[in-house]
Amino acid sequence: MAKPPVRKPKKKVCVFCQEKMTYVDYKDTTLLRKFISDRGKIRARRVTGNCTQHQRDVAKAVKNAREMALLPYTSSAR
């Protein structure tokens, strides 16, 4: 039996490059929550589709937002 053809997954596009955003603001929690899992962890680059530089910027912004108590370090769900 022949295997069905495997489709290549679509390459994800960096949201920040697409919108031509140069700065990731740590105060924009609605944007940053898209890059955090339900457990409160920062999502990987292969999951979010960010480019390398913007993934670093997102990580720094999330860490700053956590320090300023805008985002939780962990989720409250158990």
Curated annotation (Swiss-Prot):
Q: From which source organism is this entry? A: Thermobifida fusca (strain YX)
Write down the PROSITE patterns for this protein, in alphabetical order.
RIBOSOMAL_S18
The record's GO CC annotations read: cytosolic small ribosomal subunit
Please indicate which superkingdom the organism of origin belongs to.
Bacteria
**Presence of the UniProt keyword Cell membrane in the record:** no
Keyword entries, A-Z: Ribonucleoprotein, Ribosomal protein, RNA-binding, rRNA-binding
The record's family statement is: Belongs to the bacterial ribosomal protein bS18 family.
Q: SUPFAM superfamilies from the xrefs? A: Ribosomal protein S18
One GO molecular function term of this record is:
small ribosomal subunit rRNA binding
Known function: Binds as a heterodimer with protein bS6 to the central domain of the 16S rRNA, where it helps stabilize the platform of the 30S subunit.
The yes or no answer to whether the keyword Nucleus is present is no
What InterPro entries does the record tag this protein with?
A: Ribosomal_bS18, Ribosomal_bS18_CS, Ribosomal_bS18_sf
* Transmembrane spans: none
Name of a matching Pfam family:
Ribosomal_S18
What name is this protein filed under? Small ribosomal subunit protein bS18
Known partners and oligomeric status: Part of the 30S ribosomal subunit. Forms a tight heterodimer with protein bS6.
Give any single GO term for biological process: translation
User: Taxonomically, what lineage is the organism?
Assistant: Bacteria, Bacillati, Actinomycetota, Actinomycetes, Streptosporangiales
